[in-house]
Amino acid sequence: MWSILWVVTTLISIVAADPNMKELAGTWTSKSNTVFTGPGFYDPVDELLIQPDLPGISYSFTEDGHYEEALYRVTSNSQNHSCATAVLIYQHGTYEILNNGSLVMTPIAVDGRQLLSDPCGYSETESQYTRYVQPTWFKAYYVQVDSYSGKMKLQIYQFDGSLMQPLYLAYSPPLMLPTKALNPTDKASETKSSLRRKVKRSLENQYRTTAVKSFNYEKYDKYWWAAVGVIGIASASVFLH
């Protein structure tokens, strides 16, 4: 009996170990539920990073290999509470899932932006606005239904294997800015009006979705039929002996 259960568990784990772009597609946000990718975080026309109400992170992915990230982090200072630092980061680009299940994200170098507030360092009254480029490699990830909230949850393992805070599906299709370069530097660079049109088109699918509706029943059907098949074979073997 235990051998049968072991075979079933092993087979299910093999079926489950199938990372793909389709299951990543959508906009994911952290528990604060205040940080989302898209024009509500970064305005590429007027070069503005917009501060959310609370810190948090958000990632968006498309099924054809594009991503966007919005990060708002606050770091306290235990020696002086007035010296807390805050940073807003926007990046977008392309991503790929490697054969080992790791996730590699390559940003468009000219588009990354960072807004740093460091009252006891850089300036007490001004924030520092700069370009930002940081490729990202996540060791692994998995998508599952959160047992508490019933929402789809994305759990990411960072490059060192440590767990990132869980992310929950907020938008599907993803809420993103245009996936091409927003700030091209060549002679064919876009005017602000053409960029505005692109941003407007990118918002056509701006609507919320309950993550429960995005539950991937098709994938879990694989588990069911795999388990039924193994149990059937094992039962037949026991009967014949």
UniProtKB/Swiss-Prot annotation:
Side Cytoplasmic, residues: 241
Q: How does it sit in the membrane?
A: Single-pass type I membrane protein
One GO cellular component, as annotated: endoplasmic reticulum membrane
Entry's transmembrane regions: 223-240
**Topological domain spans for side Lumenal:** 18-222
Query: Taking the first listed entry, what is the main subcellular location of this protein, grouped into a coarse class?
Result: endoplasmic reticulum
Which domain of life, per UniProt?
Eukaryota
Which keywords fit this entry according to its UniProt record?
Endoplasmic reticulum, Glycoprotein, Membrane, Signal, Transmembrane, Transmembrane helix
Its annotated compartments are: Endoplasmic reticulum membrane
Explain the purpose of this protein. Required for normal levels of the cell wall 1,6-beta-glucan. Involved in a protein folding machinery chaperoning proteins acting in various physiological processes including cell wall synthesis and lysis of autophagic bodies.
Q: What's this protein's family per the entry?
A: Belongs to the ROT1 family.
Query: What name appears for this protein in its UniProt entry?
Result: Protein ROT1
Organism of this sequence:
Meyerozyma guilliermondii (strain ATCC 6260 / CBS 566 / DSM 6381 / JCM 1539 / NBRC 10279 / NRRL Y-324)
Q: Per UniProt, what is the name of the gene that codes for the protein in this document? A: ROT1
